[in-house]
Amino acid sequence: MTRLLTFALLLIFTNAFGQTKNGQTCKVEVYLLKSVKPNLDTALKLRGPFLANITDLPDTAFIKDHEIIGYTFKRDTIKFKDSIFIDNRQMFEVTSAATDRINNLKIPLCCGRQFALTVNGNIIYTGYFWNLVSSWGCDGITAFAHDTRIDILRKLPDYDFAIDSEDQRRNSILFDCLSKTNRLHK
């Protein structure tokens, strides 16, 4: 009887996480790429946007769905001399174990570590985990981990001049999944 009750509770609790109200699963996960992918713009000397597909990802997620607690937005306006800079930051709230794993990657100063963010196994966007002390530039999505937060920038500020270009971070599939699992905080 005890085994049956334990098994029933185990089924209830393991199925409760990552599901929407109608029972469909909705998983957001982050994978490190198996190998380095080249920039889409091969003339670009800095790291920049790249393409990856499902076969470029390992079997196990680097950051699992249950480690993603929430997703928030932050907008800062910085005035410097005659210029105005707008920082539209998006942030994952994660477990400290997730940020510890990122910070233990020993990310090189020059080039970051490529990752892919997925929803239900489909790649939503790709980017780089970046070293906090790096002064190198990056023309692609860049992520920094600290405390229990991963800041996701469209590009590093020194390279984010194209106001009119598409922001891959603003993805309705990602936001719908986070909203359905009560993790989207605007």
Regions found by a protein language model. Give the residues of each.
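Bacterial Sec-dependent N-terminal signal peptides
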Residues: M1-G23
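Structural signature of multi-pass, alpha-helical inner-membrane proteins
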Residues: Q19-K186
